[in-house]
């Protein structure tokens, strides 16, 4: 990676906002960008975790709930008053439950659409004017990066609510890329498969740690948050004319959304 460099005519400090920064992939993205020379503002609901991250890596933070329009407006006002903005990395999202379609709870589906689709629209609408202001002032290009999921691409039993929400977010990203065509704004989607983080599966399964652990039983090297963060950093630090429209990434053990090898990965004998 080329720290702090795009097609800006040299090295300069760029500033990014990372949502969902209090844990998991969002936290890993903050760490990766700080390591490559970015100024970073981490955004999440849990202020105490953001403050601990700031102390560890030198990021800044802003506590906000992206489901609240007033919080998003306050974030945009803070960012506008405190400097240029070159990138939005939207990680915040989540899944709730594994119900079949016929058993799905409306409140769970509504929550998933709120945190995955509407929050993405809300934060994009609020910060796109700031990204445009930066590039209009000679800031080269701007970036928007969205962490979706392979669940947006392939349905699976018990995943309908999350499948639908992530597919909605993915289509939002595709539409945005078309809408900003002709502007120096990159729109990147990163769609991870199985990622082992401290909270995602646990939250989805209602805090059942045993059930969460079973999901990963026997899987040799599922992705971890830092793997996704590395891809985000690569996309941001690529030359400014290069847009990675969609990066789908899975662990080697997961060939498709519904095909997962459990146990050691063993090469076939050449004679087989």
Identify the residue ranges that each predicted region occupies.
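Conserved glycine-rich cofactor-binding loop
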Residues: 22-23
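Conserved glycine-rich Rossmann-like NAD(P)H-binding loop of the short-chain dehydrogenase/reductase
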Residues: 36-51
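Substrate-binding pocket helix/loop in short-chain dehydrogenase/reductase
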Residues: 99-101, 105-111
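Active-site helix of classical SDR
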Residues: 124, 165-168
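Residue(s) in the substrate-gating loop at a strand-loop-helix junction
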Residues: 149
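Active-site-adjacent segment of SDR/Rossmann-fold oxidoreductases
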Residues: 154, 175-185
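C-terminal helical subdomain
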Residues: 189-190, 209-258, 262
